[in-house]
C-alpha cells in the first residue's frame, strides 16, 4: 500500500468529472487500499478518487471513532434524500478551512462494493453528510463552491500562498 498525493484547491484536476468504474481488477483493489491508507494518514473521514488524481467514481469513508468501519462506494448514486442539516465541513483538498454547507439529513444510496457487488445503504447524520461531500468531488464540486465568491477567493489566495511557501522551503 502507498500514501497518495492529495490534490489541493485550486488545482483544476479537482474539477474533473469522474468516469464510472467498468471493471473490477486487482489494480482497483490496490487503488482502494491506497485511498484508505491515504485517508487515515491525512486524518480524514472520507476520500474521493478525484482528490488523488484518479478520475473514477470511487469513494472511501470511515466515520467511526476507532477507524474500524471502512466503507467503499463505487459508482454511487443517491436514490432518495430527506431533511435538511449542515455542519462545518472540512476537506483534505482544502486544508485548514471549514465552512457550513447545507446537506440532506438522510440519504439512500445505491453503489457497488470493492468486489463489484451492488448494495443499498441508508445513512443519516455524519455518514450522510460525508457521502454527499465525497459524491460532490466525483462531479468536480468542492465545499467551497457553496460559499460566496469573496470567501472562495480568500481561501484560494491563502492556499496559493501556503503552496508558494512550501515550494520555497524545499
From Swiss-Prot:
Q: Any idea which UniProt keywords this protein has?
A: Hydrolase, Iron, Metal-binding, Protein biosynthesis
Identify the EC number(s): 3.5.1.88
Q: Which InterPro entries match?
A: Peptide_deformylase, Peptide_deformylase_sf
Q: Which Gene3D superfamilies match?
A: Peptide deformylase
MF terms (GO), sorted A to Z: metal ion binding; peptide deformylase activity
What are the recorded Gene Ontology BP terms?
co-translational protein modification; translation
**Co-factor binding comment:** Binds 1 Fe(2+) ion.
Under catalytic activity, the entry for this protein gives: N-terminal N-formyl-L-methionyl-[peptide] + H2O = N-terminal L-methionyl-[peptide] + formate
Q: Which residues bind Fe cation?
A: 91, 133, 137
Name the residues annotated as catalytic in the UniProt entry: 134
List the Pfam families hit by this protein, alphabetically: Pep_deformylase
Entry cofactors: Fe(2+)
Entry's family note = Belongs to the polypeptide deformylase family.
What is its biological role? Answer: Removes the formyl group from the N-terminal Met of newly synthesized proteins. Requires at least a dipeptide for an efficient rate of reaction. N-terminal L-methionine is a prerequisite for activity but the enzyme has broad specificity at other positions.
Kindly provide the name given to this protein in its UniProt entry: Peptide deformylase
Natural source organism: Aeromonas salmonicida (strain A449)
Give the encoding gene's name. def
